[in-house]
UniProtKB/Swiss-Prot annotation:
Coiled-coil positions: none
Molecular-function annotations in GO: magnesium ion binding; phosphoglucosamine mutase activity; phosphomannomutase activity
Organism: Clostridium botulinum (strain Loch Maree / Type A3)
Chain positions found as Phosphoserine: S100
Purpose: Catalyzes the conversion of glucosamine-6-phosphate to glucosamine-1-phosphate.
GO annotation, cellular component aspect: cytosol
Record-stated family: Belongs to the phosphohexose mutase family.
Name assigned to this protein: Phosphoglucosamine mutase
Organism classification: Bacteria, Bacillati, Bacillota, Clostridia, Eubacteriales
Keywords, ordered alphabetically: Isomerase, Magnesium, Metal-binding, Phosphoprotein
Gene name of the encoded protein: glmM
Record-linked Pfam families: PGM_PMM_I, PGM_PMM_II, PGM_PMM_III, PGM_PMM_IV
Active site: S100 (phosphoserine intermediate)
Length: 449
């Protein structure tokens, strides 16, 4: 069997790939591995608004209870809320049933350890090994040793809203905000937090029906929010994904503001407050070169990691950095939470807009995004490193890099799931880099034939 866990837990089409049987096994194995040696462990369970959530929750919880753990079910709640509340409630682990920004037919199961962090590869492998070994040496419990399910009555949502509000000083009175909840897990928390802080709140896509999560809405489809912000003269628009661990923004002119701009604006603000540890932000190799250029002007360092918020977080923890994230809107504020948190990000941005006295578009002028071109080159899986070995390809990359002369770059990334490498070029001239990227992709394809 291949590796069960992907970069963000176990994910697949619900009832076909991610079945109730698999959810039961994950609950049983996860509870056993994560709570070994604890007398009566507590595991927090939350989910997004997908129709398959109830089915998977029932199965997952059955697995948790079968090994003697208690399952505290908090219902529909954002992923970052589970990360935070696992710590706050001194739970032994947390689990979220969600497929984030994916369409409704997908679902996923993601574990957090007792400190609110995603699991290490090693722990995930231990969970998978236990399932594959058919739960060898796991005792069969009976009678009073079986765990209980505890239905939580709304306190968790209240605690998370209070926590999110506490991450800004002051209020948002006088700010006109539009929120797009993607018909997902943030449909209560984000709206309440902004209202309680005094903002004038306008909301779209906050009526989940089990099947409309992420449908033409949220951070993956911000078109409706863009139109809404402009039409209703809002000062800022904020779009969440299905489980609200990411956030993208819209300025008052209707421009989409991605995670690079959010990192630039928040990084500058943290520096101003003397809270930007080591004067550094953590980004991935896919962040726009324009962010590096902007941060250099602000005398802020950028550290680059592999793509994926787990790698950003690893780097932040290793060197105690305060902020990091991705273009997609996964932004991590290590002073506040242990994972990307859409609501915390949204509140920081809104607060900066209010306190600055500037328009959001003026704040975004901190950075000029360089044109970026991405071309896929088809390459057999066993030849994905050809760009590191072939002399002609290496020479072409060097020539392009030299010609871009510091105002652009070449980045080649092998796909982790498909037989291709991604050729990415950035530079000031869109036409020029488009031609160069396609030329380089063709050369790579020619060399593997």
């Amino acid at each position: 069997m291949g590796r069960m866990f992907g970069t963000d837990g176990v994910r697949g089409i619900a009832n076909k790939e991610l079945t109730a049987d698999l959810a039961y096994k994950l609950g049983k194995a996860g509870a056993f591995i994560l709570t070994e040696g604890t007398h009566r462990p507590k595991i927090l369970v939350g989910m997004d608004t997908r129709i398959s959530g109830d089915m998977l929750e029932s199965a997952l919880v059955a697995g948790i209870l079968s090994v003697g753990a208690e399952a505290i079910c908090v219902g529909v709640i954002p992923t970052p809320a589970i990360a935070y509340l696992t710590r706050k409630y001194n739970a032994d682990a947390g689990v979220v049933i969600s497929a984030s920004h994916n369409p409704v037919e997908y679902n996923g199961i993601k574990f957090f350890n007792k400190n609110g962090y995603k699991l290490s590869d090693e722990l995930e492998d231990n969970i998978q090994a236990l399932i594959e070994n058919n739960f060898k040496d796991v005792p069969v419990l009976t009678g009073e040793n079986i765990g209980r399910k505890i239905e939580e009555d709304g306190e968790a949502i209240r605690d998370y809203i209070d926590f999110a509000k506490s991450t800004i000083k002051g209020d948002l009175k006088g700010l006109k905000v539009a929120l797009d909840c993607a018909n997902g897990a943030s449909y209560i928390t984000s709206v309440e937090a902004f209202k309680e802080l005094g903002a004038e709140v306008h909301v779209i896509n906050n009526k989940p029906d089990g099947i409309n999560i992420n449908r033409n809405s949220g951070s993956t489809h911000p078109e409706d929010l863009i139109e809404y912000v402009v039409k209703n003269s809002c000062q800022i628009g904020l779009a969440f994904d299905g489980d609200a661990d990411r956030c993208l923004a819209i300025d008052e002119k209707g421009n989409l503001i991605n995670g690079d701009f959010i990192l630039a604006i928040c990084g500058k603000e943290l520096k101003k407050q003397g809270r930007l540890k080591k004067n550094t932000i953590v980004v991935t190799v896919m962040s726009n070169l324009g962010l590096d250029i902007a941060m250099k002007k602000e005398e802020i360092n950028t550290i680059k990691t592999k793509v994926g918020d787990r790698y950003v977080l690893e780097e932040m923890l290793r060197n105690d950095y305060a902020i990091g994230g991705e273009q997609s809107g996964h932004i991590i504020f290590s002073d506040y939470n242990t994972t990307g948190d859409g609501l915390v990000t949204a509140l920081q941005l809104a607060h900066i807009v209010k306190e600055s006295g500037k328009t959001f578009s003026e704040l975004c002028s901190i950075m000029k995004e360089l044109p970026q071109v991405l071309v896929n080159a088809k390459v057999p899986n066993d030849q994905k490193d050809i760009y590191l070995k072939d002399e002609e390809i290496k020479s072409e990359i060097d020539t392009i890099t030299k010609n871009l002369d510091g105002s652009g770059r070449v980045l080649i990334r092998p796909s982790g799931t498909e037989p291709l490498v991604r050729v990415m070029l950035e530079g000031e001239n869109q036409g020029e880099i488009d031609k160069l990227a396609h030329g380089l992709a063709k050369l790579i394809e020619k060399k593997v034939k």
